[in-house]
Each structure stands twice: as structure tokens, then as C-alpha cells.
Design a protein with these regions (language model features):
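Active-site C-terminal subdomain of aminotransferase-like
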Residues: 2-94, 99
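Short, hydrophobic beta-strand segments
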Residues: 63-64, 108-109, 143-147
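A short linear hydrophobic-aromatic micro-motif
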Residues: 94-97, 129-134
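Conserved PLP-binding catalytic core of the aspartate aminotransferase-like
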Residues: 96-124
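Short Gly/Ser/Thr- and Asp/Glu-enriched loop/turn motifs at secondary-structure junctions
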Residues: 100-105, 136-142
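Short amphipathic alpha-helices in soluble, non-transmembrane regions
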Residues: 118-126, 158-165
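A common structural junction motif
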Residues: 124-132, 165-172
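PLP-dependent enzyme catalytic core of the Aspartate aminotransferase-like
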Residues: 137-174
């Protein structure tokens, strides 16, 4: 299992987490080899990371997790998911086609054709109400939404949806 600490916990980019219950598989996939390497008798950190010399990346991740605690992380993850589901439902109710099952914090939406989808995305970005990006899905242009800030509220989602609707209506007129 891998988790992106940056996307979920808003830690620096290089704070990924790997959970593996097979110690031998983890070590063999990450271990550097060389006759010059001196291994310690205790748990050696270089056996569990893809490089041997690195800064203490774990500090930011550890501090965030320590501050939030189990319940804080739980509230964050479930809160992001709830707001993402809200985003998907409000967009669907407003006439957008939601293409994915919302399993965490991503929504893919499209309009009736690629041209209107592209224009809608451009107008949403120009509005500066929220940020989303474009992508391709099944040979169609889509708008990719990622709800990833702990500070995002239900009202923020509704305001963002209003920006989507305004942009969509304007794109259809052009």
C-alpha cells in the first residue's frame, strides 16, 4: 500500500509512505548492494529506502501526523472524501457528467463535447474561485478536480460549483 503524504496531509512533496508487511520483499526491492557497505546489527534505515544518503524527510511527515493524531487524520481523510462527494453530487445536479466513482478526493467531469469542456475549464481557471486541471479520459477531455485542503468547507464547494455552472453557461454561449 502506498500513500502520498503531500496530497492528503499537505506535507512536502517527498513524503510518500509505503506500508508493506513482507520485510524481505521490501528490503530486497530497495536495498543497495556493494562490498563497501557496512551493515549495522540493528534495523538499518538504508535498507528501507531507495537511497542511502538523504535528508530527514520523515520529520515533516512525523510532525504532521503527531500533531493531527489518529482522530485528526481520520477527520481529515473522511472530511476530504465527504466534500469530494458533495462536489460530485452538486456538479451532477447542475448538469455535468461525473465520470468516476468517487472513492477518495478526485472527481472527473465533462460537458457534452470536448470544446465546451475545454472552454469551461479555461473559464473556471480564469475565475480564480477554485483550481482544477484538464486531463484525458477514454479519449475525452475532462476536468479533473482534487479536493486536497483541510481548510475546504462545504460552502467552498458550493461556491466552486457556482463557478463551474457560470463558466459552463458562458462556454455554451461562445
Amino acid at each position: 500500500l502506498s500513500v502520498d503524504g503531500h496530497k492528503t496531509l499537505n506535507t512536502p512533496y517527498d513524503c510518500g509512505i509505503i506500508l508493506c508487511n513482507d520485510r524481505e520483499a521490501l528490503v530486497s526491492s530497495l536495498q543497495a548492494t556493494g562490498s563497501y557497505i557496512i551493515y549495522g546489527e540493528k534495523r538499518d534505515g538504508m535498507l528501507y529506502t531507495p537511497e542511502m544518503s538523504r535528508r530527514a524527510r520523515i520529520v515533516e511527515l512525523w510532525a504532521t501526523m503527531k500533531y493531527l493524531g489518529r482522530h485528526g487524520i481520520d477527520d481529515l481523510v473522511y472530511g476530504l472524501h465527504a466534500r469530494t462527494i458533495q462536489f460530485a453530487h452538486e456538479l451532477k445536479d447542475s448538469g455535468f457528467q461525473v465520470l468516476n466513482d468517487v472513492v477518495f478526493n478526485q472527481v472527473l467531469v465533462t460537458c457534452e463535447n470536448d470544446d465546451i469542456t475545454s472552454k469551461t475549464l479555461e473559464l473556471i481557471q480564469e475565475s480564480r474561485e477554485c483550481w482544477c486541471g484538464g486531463a484525458q479520459w477514454d479519449n475525452r477531455k475532462v476536468i479533473r478536480i482534487s479536493v486536497c485542503s483541510w481548510a475546504t468547507t462545504s460552502d467552498d464547494i458550493s461556491r466552486s460549483v457556482k463557478a463551474f455552472v457560470k463558466a459552463y453557461n458562458e462556454a455554451k454561449r461562445k
